[in-house]
Amino acid sequence: MNKPTIAITSLTCCEGCQVAILDLGERFLRLTGKIKIGDFAFLEEHPESEEFDIVFVEGAPITKKNKERLLNLRRRSKILVALGACACLGGIAEIKDYQDKEERVRYVYKNIDSIENPDIKPLRDYVKVDLEIPGCPINKEEFLDVVKKLIMVISQGLTMEQMPKIARRPVCYDCQLKQNICLLQKGLPCLGPIMLAGCDAPCPTSGYPCDGCRGPLKNVNPDNLNKQLIKQGYSQQEIDMILQRFGVLEEIYPQLPVKA
């Protein structure tokens, strides 16, 4: 059986998700015995392959060059996986979509005639995405599990409907497994009830409220949580700022206009 050729690459981001992959240590090295690394800049400067069975793309397509590269990667791959919050949601960069973008440009760049300043969107808005592994950074164990399952998909000729799925449950589920004290009940602005689990709840476990880096559950109704946070004394502006952090606000309230 031929080894599947895999690329792990990035657009505009901090590349922290790729660091999380390397945190697998020896397990990642063992994984490379089952796959061919066609492109991974953390290991080799230049790609070894032009076509890929699976490409993992971290980061958001912020520039025209990013978008062209994303389209090119899609054409050259059988399966495309969005890797991390920036790729799945827009991520930290999307915060500027909720501000006066032109004003922010003038604040950062004192003397400039023009600059690319588009709205920040997830990969799925530009190309077909076969699977999303969310998080900031990703959960390395989830990545390893997905890669192993994708190898089976390719080697056994399975259909896209038989692709591995990310479990749909709230972060509260992970907290309960860890017997964590509920931060929402302690008065902290935790988004756990409406956000996707799978991260193993490291933030609530450390006493830090979930701020939604894995994105919202599908078809979630955030209004009850919003009312609870208002009752606890948080202003709507404070709540919105938390939801804006990873681009979650636009995901759960897509009808809201972003600022130009």
Predicted regions and their residues:
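Portal/gating segments that form or line small-molecule/metal binding sites
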Residues: 96
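Short beta-strand elements at the ligand-binding edges of bilobed clamshell
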Residues: 99
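Iron-sulfur (Fe-S) cluster-binding modules
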Residues: 1-56, 61, 65-79, 102-260
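Short gly/pro/ser/thr-enriched loop/turn and capping motifs at secondary-structure boundaries
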Residues: 86-91
